[in-house]
Amino acid sequence: MTEAIIDLKDIAVTFDDGHQVVHAVQDVNLQIQTGDIYGIIGYSGAGKSTLVRVINLLQSPTTGQVVVNGQALQTLSPAALRQARKHVGMIFQHFNLMQSRTVMGNVIYPLLGQKISKQNRRAKALRLLKLVGLTDYAQTYPDKLSGGQKQRVAIARALVTDPQILISDEATSALDPKTTTAILELLQRVNRELGITIVLITHEMQVIKSICHHVAVMADGRIIERGPVAEVFTAPKAPLTVDFVETSTNVRAAIQRITKTIKLSELAAGQELIAFKFVGQSTKQGIVSQLSQTLGVDVNILFANIDQIDGQNVGDMIAIITGDLTAFNAAVTNMSAQGVHTRIINEEVVKGMVD
């Protein structure tokens, strides 16, 4: 295992204005490995943005220890902390560009005051503008740029100090889907070509699914679930995680549509409405034909979807399975052995687990 570049230990952040105490972050332990793209997801108010501001001590924790690049940040002198912060770049939803400066002026701004010649500053900025695809816009002012172009400038500016970590705080939230995809692909390229560790904050599971290797789910200031993205998508445990996953894969909408169309009380004896989750090699196997031909189970497919998540195929299917109880139990056992997860939807509806 590679070394943890970020190690947050027993972090809590409490705000007290004299009238109300807010526990923004509670009992968080988080390790992020060098070179990872780590997503932190949660709804507004979950504490995710507060947590990532702890990484470079823009927000001091009430309790806990912050270790970045092997340095315990709370023990550093102000000068040493300023130097450590140069290794952590940040991009935000609203870009924070200076309107009075050109694209070039915005990118080189963090280098002003450093012992770098004007020629070298410009050369470095041009290399980064080439990386983000804005070489021809060096002398353009921000008000002439699209939202996606502004975010590319912000990324170049964040990289100009040669950070080892890049924090993306809802950086795609204000962008349209096509531009979001382009920015996420750029972040992947930054991670791949420059080896920069990326911490990505979002409320959209689609963003996590697109580029992250690991994910932590936050609610009420706590991490309620974490793990490799493909694993979390395949077998989410916390109800909030299930909600995020099923929304991003359209499974929730499909279940709602199907259960409104089909009267579950009219399912015949020996029929079940089943949701299947496939991962990895199981997506390439003819499991449906196996069920039909080997076990004598009829499969009526009502919904199917397949995604690629962190290099693995992850598929969903909803179907009505028809067969006697023995055949059905044999089918479930057979699929579990091949890495296929199953859920009986009609039982969940009866128990009120599905809206």
From Swiss-Prot:
It is a peripheral membrane protein. Its main location: membrane. InterPro entries: AAA+_ATPase (IPR003593), ABC_transporter-like_ATP-bd (IPR003439), ABC_transporter-like_CS (IPR017871), ACT-like_dom_sf (IPR045865), MetN_ABC (IPR041701), MetN_ABC_transporter-like (IPR050086), NIL_domain (IPR018449), P-loop_NTPase (IPR027417). The keyword Cell membrane applies. Belongs to the ABC transporter superfamily. Methionine importer (TC 3.A.1.24) family. The complex is composed of two ATP-binding proteins (MetN), two transmembrane proteins (MetI) and a solute-binding protein (MetQ). Part of the ABC transporter complex MetNIQ involved in methionine import. Responsible for energy coupling to the transport system. This is Methionine import ATP-binding protein MetN 1. It comes from Lactiplantibacillus plantarum (strain ATCC BAA-793 / NCIMB 8826 / WCFS1). The lineage of its organism: Bacteria, Bacillati, Bacillota, Bacilli, Lactobacillales.
